[in-house]
């Protein structure tokens, strides 16, 4: 696991860009961001535990940092400043030290019940200190001993240890598995207990995907919880990267990215955000070069609804998304982490680097990607565009995992399957509730899309299995969701999604309207040719859709209430010559009225 700062605020402040970064922290001069033998984990250290045996191929092994590689002390506050946080750091230093930020250590320790006196943090309102009085009964089967023969301990983490084991009987008799053993004595807070309960629930719900480590069952007794998983003996993705000299060829990187994107798109469709994606959390099933890749370690994962935002800071420093640090994020944060992995695969270095966690966070928030240093000049323009669109700091402009599989760099690979994208239904919901004027504006914009830009929308439309006359209805969406959902999602999320699209119950939608409904304006805005798209779309809108409109009528179409100063907000949306929408008004209509614009007008 990575960092965990669990102090969510009721109302996340999107404008506070330094929530987790001590303002007086500084970093070193430009250093090497090349990937070291092991990534830096940031949990609090437990000095009373013996070091675990190294086992890089088990799903739950969480290695401690290699202390012999790093200096013992963090740099003092006020140490020499780092290179500019506005550009990707250069690669001049062989490895970064683990130096955890103190506030993160304290929060991790508090979450898992091992706070040291000098690191104690203020308990959250609903948090219980100590293990006394906590209900540590999970309702799991108590027959672990009768079903499994336990082998040697092969790894020890901060919250448990891992053993090899074998099935004693049944259809899997003699099969090796990995067993994560979590001592109940370690569960000294209500949060820690809930973490275990949620992890098992998520593993049980997601099991079955080819690129996800298989979950067999969970057991418990008076002292431990036992989570039985598939044994993966091919090693970590990180180890494969290092064995190849630090980077992959483009073709080999594509093969890895397709598997990662497939499983993450699957998780997101089921309403699960992983929150700790990194090379260490992907294992190969076997040592074969073409072995399947498996996602592991759902200890920080959580459920998230389509319109919900999470606000607790979790993950691993090098892979954490900017919006996580802003305490307002969703599934897009996983895509950022995939972008970091793709950057590492293609060049062997991390895109954001500093000597401390707070320095890394500052780089994540402020640094701009650079593709000037070797080997980037020799990397294809499609691959660089792929990485850029995953590492866009604005989560609204970032590709989804399903969209990334439709990117020109990847989409022509062999045996690729395009998954259903939850974003389509979120955008359709907004479209169905939009005014006729905004729908006309979106239809004009959709007519400017290129063949490559239409590819993703065509694949999504095909997955909805339209009728022979090329239309879809609510029933098509229902059947598509049922085909692509786990049993857990069928029971919980499908109905909610269908209710939000209830307007399609009484009408049908053709592909042309679907493109307008499922089009992301923000993602188009991230493209270099956005200005061209917008100008062409406005010309089309002028011919078919634009009309004279009063500010009051426009405010009504946009759903602005009487308390909003509509003339101050919308005065530049309308041309004074003929009362029609201006180009600026058209572009703003595509986005809708922002709360920032309203606040500024007030």
From Swiss-Prot:
Catalysed reaction, written as an equation: L-seryl-[protein] + ATP = O-phospho-L-seryl-[protein] + ADP + H(+); L-threonyl-[protein] + ATP = O-phospho-L-threonyl-[protein] + ADP + H(+)
Active site: 276
Binding site for ATP: 154-162, 180
Enzymatic class: transferase
Domain EF-hand: 451-486, 487-527, 528-563, 564-602
Domain of life: Eukaryota
Positions of the Protein kinase domain: 148-410
CDD domains given in the database record: STKc_CAMK (cd05117)
UniProt keyword terms in alphabetical order: ATP-binding, Kinase, Nucleotide-binding, Repeat, Serine/threonine-protein kinase, Transferase
Keyword Kinase carried by entry: yes
Start-end of each Sequence repeat: 20-26, 27-33, 34-40
Record EC number: 2.7.11.1
UniProt cross-references to SMART domains, sorted A to Z: S_TKc (SM00220)
GO molecular function: ATP binding; protein serine kinase activity; protein serine/threonine kinase activity
InterPro entries from the UniProt entry: CDPK_Ser/Thr_kinases, EF-hand-dom_pair, Kinase-like_dom_sf, Prot_kinase_dom, Protein_kinase_ATP_BS, Ser/Thr_kinase_AS
Domain statement: All EF-hand domains seem to be non-functional.
PANTHER family, sorted: SERINE/THREONINE-PROTEIN KINASE
Name this polypeptide is given: CDPK-related protein kinase
Gene this protein is translated from: CRK
């Amino acid at each position: 696991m990575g960092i965990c700062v669990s102090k969510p605020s009721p109302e996340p402040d999107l404008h506070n860009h330094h929530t987790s970064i001590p303002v007086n922290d500084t970093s070193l001069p430009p250093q090497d961001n090349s990937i070291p033998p092991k990534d830096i984990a940031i949990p609090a250290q437990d000095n009373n535990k013996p070091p675990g045996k190294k086992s890089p191929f088990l799903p739950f092994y969480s290695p401690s940092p290699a202390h012999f590689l790093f200096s013992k002390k963090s740099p003092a506050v006020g140490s020499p400043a780092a290179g500019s946080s506005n550009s990707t750091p250069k690669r001049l230093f062989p490895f970064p030290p683990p130096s955890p930020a103190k506030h993160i250590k304290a929060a991790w320790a508090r979450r898992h019940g091992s706070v040291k006196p000098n690191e104690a943090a203020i308990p959250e309102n609903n948090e219980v200190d100590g293990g006394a009085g906590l209900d540590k009964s999970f309702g799991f089967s108590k027959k672990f001993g009768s079903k499994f023969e336990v082998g040697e301990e092969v790894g020890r983490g901060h919250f448990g240890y891992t053993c090899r084991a074998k099935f004693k009987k049944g259809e899997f008799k003699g099969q090796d598995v990995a067993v994560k053993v979590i001592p109940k004595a370690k569960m000294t807070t209500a949060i820690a207990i809930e973490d275990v309960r949620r992890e098992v629930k998520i593993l049980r719900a997601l099991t079955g995907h080819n690129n996800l480590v298989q979950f067999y069952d969970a057991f418990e007794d008076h002292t431990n919880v036992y989570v039985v998983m598939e044994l993966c003996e091919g090693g970590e993705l990180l180890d494969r990267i290092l064995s190849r000299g630090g980077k992959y060829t483009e073709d080999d990187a594509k093969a890895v990215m397709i598997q990662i994107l497939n499983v993450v798109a699957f998780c997101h469709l089921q309403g699960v955000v992983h929150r700790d994606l990194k090379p260490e959390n992907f294992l190969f099933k076997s040592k074969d070069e073409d072995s399947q890749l498996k996602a592991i370690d759902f200890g920080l994962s959580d459920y998230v609804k389509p319109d919900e935002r999470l606000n607790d800071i979790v993950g691993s420093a090098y892979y954490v998304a900017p919006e996580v640090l802003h305490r307002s994020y969703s599934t897009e944060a996983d895509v950022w982490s995939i972008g970091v992995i793709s950057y590492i695969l293609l060049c062997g270095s991390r895109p954001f680097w500093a000597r401390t966690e707070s320095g890394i966070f500052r780089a994540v928030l402020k640094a701009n990607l650079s593709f000037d240093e070797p080997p980037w000049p020799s990397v294809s323009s499609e691959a660089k565009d792929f990485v850029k669109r995953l590492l866009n700091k604005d989560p609204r402009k970032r590709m989804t995992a399903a969209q990334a599989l439709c990117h020109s760099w990847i989409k022509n690979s062999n045996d690729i399957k395009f998954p259903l994208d939850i974003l389509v239904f979120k955008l359709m919901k907004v479209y169905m509730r939009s005014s006729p004027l905004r729908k006309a504006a979106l239809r004009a914009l959709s007519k400017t899309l290129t063949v490559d830009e239409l590819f993703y929308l065509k694949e999504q439309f095909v997955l909805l299995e339209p009728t022979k006359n090329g239309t879809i209805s609510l029933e098509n969406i229902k059947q598509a969701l049922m085909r692509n959902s786990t049993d857990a999602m069928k029971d919980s999320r499908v109905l909610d999604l269908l209710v939000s699209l209830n307007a399609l119950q009484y009408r049908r939608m053709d592909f042309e309207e679907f493109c307008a409904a499922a089009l992301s304006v923000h993602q188009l805005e991230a493209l270099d040719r956005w200005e061209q798209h917008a100008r062409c779309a406005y010309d089309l809108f002028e011919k078919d859709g634009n009309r004279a409109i009063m500010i009051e009528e426009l405010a009504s179409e946009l759903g602005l209430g009487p308390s909003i100063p509509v003339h101050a907000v919308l005065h530049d949306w309308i041309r004074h010559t003929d009362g029609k929408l201006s180009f600026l008004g058209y572009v703003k209509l595509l986005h809708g009225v922002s709360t920032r614009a309203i606040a500024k007008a007030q």
